Amino acid sequence: MFLELIAVAVAGFAGAGGIMALRLATGGALPRWLIPVGAGLAMLAATISSEYAWFSRTSQALPEGLEVASSVSSTAFYRPWTYVVPLTDRFVAVDTGNLRPNEQDGLYMADLYFFGRWRPVRSVQMMIDCPAGRRADPALGDGSDPVWRDVGPDDPIVRTVCEGV
């Protein structure tokens, strides 16, 4: 986060410097108020670029065995450009290298990692029933059965786990 702040500040100085160089090249024909406008536009462009690059940068840095199962794109009124190209701001990764089979065929315990922009990574264990296309949080250890959700074989998490075995 700190490095992104530094990058935005550097972009602002570069934008202002570019406008100052244009003013010098045109003999002062451009108005002086364009200098802070150039700085602001450069800072905005750096911020937007960083926001859009987060998903690809983070997903490419995942360790071997972690596969992206699903991503969520969003729009916001305070980011009007997201209505043109939605911004991916969170995703779920499955640790396919560490799937644990159950005694019952087709049942697997998987570790899921939830990544979000400006949020800490959360991990959850989930049971996946590949033949039935359903998933459940594991039982709490109190002897109760897990609550299964029928999500179908096309569910991104079920598909990623079942293809990973």
Language model: regions and residue ranges:
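Extracytosolic and intramembrane catalytic regions of membrane-associated proteins
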Residues: 83-165
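Alpha-helical transmembrane signal-anchor/signal-peptide segments
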Residues: 52-73
